[in-house]
Curated annotation (Swiss-Prot):
Biased composition (Basic and acidic residues): 12-23, 152-175, 231-240, 293-310
Protein family per UniProt: Belongs to the RRP36 family.
Keyword Nucleus attributed: yes
KW DNA-binding (keyword) present: no
Assembly: Associates with 90S and pre-40S pre-ribosomal particles.
Gene name linked to the record: RRP36
Species, as recorded: Fusarium vanettenii (strain ATCC MYA-4622 / CBS 123669 / FGSC 9596 / NRRL 45880 / 77-13-4) (Fusarium solani subsp. pisi)
Feature: compositional bias, Acidic residues: 24-43, 52-74
Bias-annotated ranges (Low complexity): 106-121
GO terms for biological process, alphabetical: maturation of SSU-rRNA from tricistronic rRNA transcript (SSU-rRNA, 5.8S rRNA, LSU-rRNA)
GO cellular component, one term: nucleolus
Entry function: Component of the 90S pre-ribosome involved in the maturation of rRNAs. Required for early cleavages of the pre-RNAs in the 40S ribosomal subunit maturation pathway.
Official protein name in the record: rRNA biogenesis protein RRP36
Length: 310
């Protein structure tokens, strides 16, 4: 124990590893005043270090099995920071590790941990070469997957009304025979004629100009539809007669002759003018001439406007 006490008294003579310190230059004015304080702080720090080492040695001796009673530990002297100069404090702070370095190292550690913890992209568990589901037997229902994309179209307000359809004009029934349909609904022509006669009578009675103009437009539309039906019937009758003649010639061993569209129009005009008087034919030709002249005039006006714009 005497040896230990002697070592504490001669603690300044022991070798101490000097810490690596940065060079710090003091002001010439504060060098004289701070040198003594620095020496005192260094001496007290060395004494505290030696006391700590002695305490460690005592703990090791007690653990090895010595039955000696431990002596009361010497209290380390407390340093009064108010008596220390700023130069000494700055020097002591320079020896400590900087907080900026710690923060940078912590940032890099967090970034590396983030990169390590980022999950890898998911891979589809289903391979492209998966076999399609097969039926157990030909009588069993076929298995279908439920993982199908849902269509983006949505029926917001469903129409719950019953949808009616006419089976006569349904394509599922088959192709419509116009000749049979015209014969079956021939009575409609009488109804149309009656409607036209009623409209003519109303046009004569009404005094309202707007209503009269409306009824005149309706009558004109009905007459134009009637003329269109009549022209269509004439064309069909002409083709029927031509096919009948050609069949007879083919039976005699001659080659068939098919009418062109232009020939059909010529023969229709000839038949139409045959049933007219001379005055009716002249009026029909005059109307046709005016119609063609008006069409040509419109085309010329359009061409002149296009040239002026160009």
């Amino acid at each position: 124990m005497a040896f230990k006490r002697k070592s504490t008294a001669l603690g300044l003579e022991r070798r101490v590893r000097p810490r690596r310190e940065d060079r710090w230059e003091e002001d010439p004015e504060s060098q004289g005043s701070s040198s003594e304080d620095d020496d005192e702080v260094e001496e007290e720090g060395v004494r505290g270090q030696h006391n700590d080492e002695d305490e460690d040695e005592e703990g090791s001796d007690s653990e090895e099995g010595s039955e000696e009673e431990p002596e009361p530990e010497e209290q380390t002297p407390k340093v009064d920071l108010s008596s220390i100069s700023f130069g000494a404090l700055a020097k002591a702070q320079a020896t400590l590790p900087s907080t900026s370095r710690r923060s940078k190292s912590s940032k890099t550690a967090t970034e590396s941990s983030r990169t390590e913890t980022t999950p890898a992209p998911r891979k589809s568990t289903r391979s492209k070469d998966d076999p399609k589901p097969k039926r157990s037997s030909k009588h069993a229902p076929q298995e279908q997957t439920s993982k199908k994309p849902v269509s983006r179209r949505r029926e917001i307000l469903p129409d719950n009304r019953r949808q009616y359809r006419d089976p006569r004009f349904d394509p599922l029934v088959g192709k419509v025979d116009e000749e049979k349909a015209s014969k079956a609904y021939a009575f409609l022509d009488e109804y149309r004629e009656k409607e036209m006669s009623d409209l003519r009578a109303q046009i004569k009675k009404t005094k309202d100009t707007y209503a009269k103009e409306d009824m005149k437009r309706q009558l004109q539309a009905m007459e134009s539809r009637k003329k269109a039906r009549k022209r269509k019937e004439e064309e069909e009758n002409l083709l029927k007669e031509h096919r009948k003649k050609e069949k007879e010639l083919v039976a005699q061993g001659k080659t068939p002759f098919y009418l062109k569209r232009s020939e059909q129009k010529k023969q229709i005009l000839v038949k139409r003018y045959e049933g007219m008087s001379k005055g009716q034919v002249d009026r029909a030709i005059e109307r046709k001439r005016k119609k063609v002249a008006g069409k040509e005039k419109k085309e010329l006006d359009w061409l002149q406007g296009a040239r002026e714009r160009g």
